[in-house]
Amino acid sequence: MSKPEETSDPNPTGPDPSRSSSDEVTVTVADRAPSDLNHVSEELSDQLRNVGLDDSAKELSVPISVPQGNVETDSRALFGSDQKEEEEGSEKRMMMVYPVRPDSEDCSFYMRTGSCKYGSSCKFNHPVRRKLQIGRERVRERDEDVENPKLMECKYYFRTGGCKYGESCRFSHMKEHNSPASVPELNFLGLPIRPGEKECPFYMRNGSCKFGSDCKFNHPDPTAIGGVDSPLYRGNNGGSFSPKAPSQASSTSWSSTRHMNGTGTAPFIPSMFPHSRGVTPQASDWNGYQASSAYPPERSPLAPSSYQVNNSLAETSSFSQYQHQMSVEEFPERPDQPECTYYLKTGDCKFKYKCKYHHPKNRLPKQAAFSFNDKGLPLRPDQSMCTHYSRYGICKFGPACRFDHSIPPTFSPSSSQTVEARQVGANGNEDDSWH
């Protein structure tokens, strides 16, 4: 039996890397004898078997990496998201996620919230029962809130307006028996009077309050306070003004003058707000000398009688007294401020108690030696007649006017009636004489 010729390897230096393993196996099998084929097949089967085992081992040896960023989410992914499991299973999972270290200190964050962001790497103790106790406490508090919803006091019930929900309110109205006088007393403006509280600053400056009866501050009644130092009529810089005192003085002077008449008939009194025919007050500062007559003296339907003219001196003296007292009260003294130049010149100031300058009382201009007529206008015989007063019977300057406001000497009731008759005959309409 002849041996097969051995062929020399064309590449003695080593295997060609470009040739695959299958080519090498084919060449080897072709060159070998048939008796060696069984041995080669066994080697190939062993290699294939080992390759499958290595792949399966690699698949089994892949580590399961769990990130530590969100332990609670990872625990749900590992152990399921069902929240209705039994306590034993939840305790086991808690032990796996959060370490129990009896020798260490309790984790403060875990004791408060029932969770820990460090998870199994935390070095503190995590009692297993803590999270379960927190859940039970929350459920218990929720049940208590449902059973007792009226644990908090209703903040609207104890105000003046009360609670609009009434008995259906979910908050407590339990102080109704303990505080029967919860509704405060109201002043004449309908604002609450609270003696123990601080005075409402807006009300003390302006006399009104936008909060109304719900305001928690005190709103004293100015009629009960009275006096010159009433805080309701304070100026911007501390000055005070109370119109109550002048009104009382004026009412006293008018009443005393009324009783001075010996005939028993009340004399003519210049009213501050008269209701004469054809006159309608249009402003709050409408004065008596402006609204006392809307017609010329020769056309006035109510001509003054002789006793009214005779008693005018008594009326003017009381009016001048009232005016002087009012000027003293309504102009504030502010020693730390500059003096009001207009007040020093004229004795008057249009800002009155709101003026921020000083109004010294001892430097008031001297009262001129003249009297006033029955309308409160000055009688200055040495001056010319006031044209506005001679035409219309009123003067917008009032007592400060520098002209004369005496009754025209040609005035008489008969002449006024004659003038009226002429106008009625000429126009043919009685109403034309009044317009």
Swiss-Prot record:
Localization per Swiss-Prot or TrEMBL: Nucleus
Bias-annotated ranges (Low complexity): 247-256
InterPro entries: Plant_ZF_CCCH, Znf_CCCH, Znf_CCCH_sf
Annotated region (Disordered), positions in chain: 1-91, 235-274, 412-435
GO cellular component terms listed in the entry, alphabetical order: nucleus
Record-annotated disulphide pairs: none
Keyword Zinc-finger: yes
Zinc finger (C3H1-type): 101-129, 148-176, 194-222, 334-362, 380-408
GO molecular function, one term: mRNA binding
Primary location recorded for the protein, binned into one broad class: nucleus
Keywords of the record: DNA-binding, Metal-binding, Nucleus, Repeat, Zinc, Zinc-finger
Protein name, entry field: Zinc finger CCCH domain-containing protein 67
Source organism phylogeny: Eukaryota, Viridiplantae, Streptophyta, Embryophyta, Tracheophyta
